[in-house]
């Protein structure tokens, strides 16, 4: 009897807690997503697609010469907006690179025309929070980012073809003399003896090098050319020249600098340079 009484009380408490959670929960998916975003306090903006135009070097505010990669936002348009009502989540699809209508597929032309955008070559999708949604047909420019902001870039690395273990993995190789012949650049032993009697999966060997998607994190924007929609990013970016690069706000940000939400209100002109903030990062020793 005592056990049945305890079970009935626990069932009643569970029912009451469930009812309270249901009454406090948002009634629509949109409200639930907005509530989650407000609770986390984090806004996830849409990214963009850029074209890698090459590398050069500039001088930062402290007079240090730094290598930079030029990324141009070439005709970047929002081609589709996804919501929980239609797709189950919030997302923004963007396209970049003008394509010739007679070379683009009919489905691509129709998809872009639905968003009042010209036929495009490359497409990418980004999950966003409700406060960062963008209308279909909106064009993204370099003003979507700001100087000093950190970004993550993703692209296909330059293909190197079939390479040996010394170039592909940095192996030491075999001795040059002392009885070694022909196999100076070979990998050497690949396993053990009868036990386990096989080569483990993932063993580093010679093979195709490069031509893989890679993401580089936390690259800083040190200059923005608004007239040409070019971002000057500190450091190297994976991919060859004229390759499409996917850009997003840095996931692991070193500082709180971020772009406007959901994007810039109006286009800008001229160029913006990184300004001095705080102490000299290159200062190591101070004279008395």
Describe each PLM feature range.
Residues 2-288:
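Extended basic (Lys/Arg/His-rich) segments that typically form rRNA-contacting surfaces
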């Amino acid at each position: 009897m005592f056990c049945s009484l305890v079970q009935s009380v626990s069932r009643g408490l569970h029912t009451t807690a469930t009812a309270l959670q249901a009454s406090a929960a948002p009634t629509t998916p949109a409200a639930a997503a907005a509530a989650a975003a407000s609770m986390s306090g984090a806004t996830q903006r849409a990214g963009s697609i850029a074209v890698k135009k090459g590398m050069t070097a500039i001088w930062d505010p402290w007079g240090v010469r730094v290598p930079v990669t030029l990324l141009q936002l070439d005709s970047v348009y929002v081609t589709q907006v996804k919501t929980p009502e239609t797709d189950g989540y919030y997302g923004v699809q963007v396209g970049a690179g003008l394509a010739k209508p007679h070379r683009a597929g009919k489905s691509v032309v129709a998809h872009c025309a639905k968003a009042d955008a010209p036929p495009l070559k490359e497409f990418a999708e980004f999950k966003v929070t409700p406060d960062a949604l963008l209308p279909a047909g909106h064009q993204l420019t370099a003003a979507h980012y700001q100087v000093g902001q950190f970004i993550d870039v993703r692209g296909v690395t330059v293909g190197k073809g079939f390479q040996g273990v010394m170039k592909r993995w940095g192996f030491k190789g075999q001795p040059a003399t002392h009885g070694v012949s022909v196999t100076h650049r070979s990998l050497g032993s690949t396993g053990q003896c009868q036990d386990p009697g096989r080569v483990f999966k993932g063993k580093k060997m010679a093979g195709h090098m490069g031509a893989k998607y890679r993401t580089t994190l936390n690259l800083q924007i040190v200059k923005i050319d608004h007239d040409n929609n070019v971002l000057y990013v500190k450091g190297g970016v994976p991919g060859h020249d004229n390759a499409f690069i996917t850009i997003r706000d840095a996931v692991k940000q070193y500082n709180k600098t971020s772009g406007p939400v959901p994007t810039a209100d109006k286009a800008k002109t001229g160029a913006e340079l990184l300004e001095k903030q705080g102490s000299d990062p290159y200062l190591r020793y101070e004279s008395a």
